[in-house]
Amino acid sequence: TREELERELLRIVRRINPNLTTRTNTYNKPKTETDIGIVRQPFTDVDKQYWKQFGIHIDTLKKFNVFSIKYFLCNSVVRSTYKETSPMYAYKVYDKFKIYRPLASKFTKWRTNLTNRHVQGLAELPKEGGEILIITKSLKDVMCCYEMGFNAIAASSETTFIPEDILKSLRSKWKHILILYDRDATGMHKAREYSKQYKIDAFFINKKFKAKDLSDAVKVNGFNIVKDWLVNTLRKYD
């Protein structure tokens, strides 16, 4: 076998050079889970201004377990600290965290140990269900929906969808489930794919808002204007 051949070659090499040190191959070693820890702090004025531009209030952040953090750790190593020029937030989803640095580069904006089972906003839904549930692509948009009077959830990342067993359970409680993804090539493609696969209606932010998602539309156009549009758009599902 390959293992026997490797052991025999190792014995030969050691006879030739007894002082040689070798290390065991680790390519089959399973990946260890990243442990993320946080140190919370009160919301600063910078934080309040940042979330206010999306129409999201502090009480809503608290409801959805969003924290301002001094720093976070990965496997007990400090990875980043809060700065007023680069604020930092932790989304707690059940027992895991998603770190969000909105002003950082796209390479360091996110850090997460969520799995696809960690559906954002799921724990905050009314247990009895209701009329309309929106599946969107971020917790920020989930919170915008909540501020506008609608219930919403988001998958753990933009590359996954709601697990089928969770979706099945939601179908039994919600009369209408809709998809609201980004108005860009990727978002529209994935929304239509999931719409066809799961037979769920998909819709997108109106082009007139010149924004790709709900939170950006609020930032650019104002909360009440976008809320009126959303209410009117969803009226047909009443």
Report each predicted region and the residues it spans.
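Phosphate-handling DNA/RNA-contact segment within nucleic-acid enzymes
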Residues: 72-174, 190-191
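TOPRIM fold recognition
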Residues: 128-133, 139-238
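Non-catalytic accessory segments of DNA primases and related replication-initiation nucleases
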Residues: 1-73, 96-115, 147-148, 160, ...
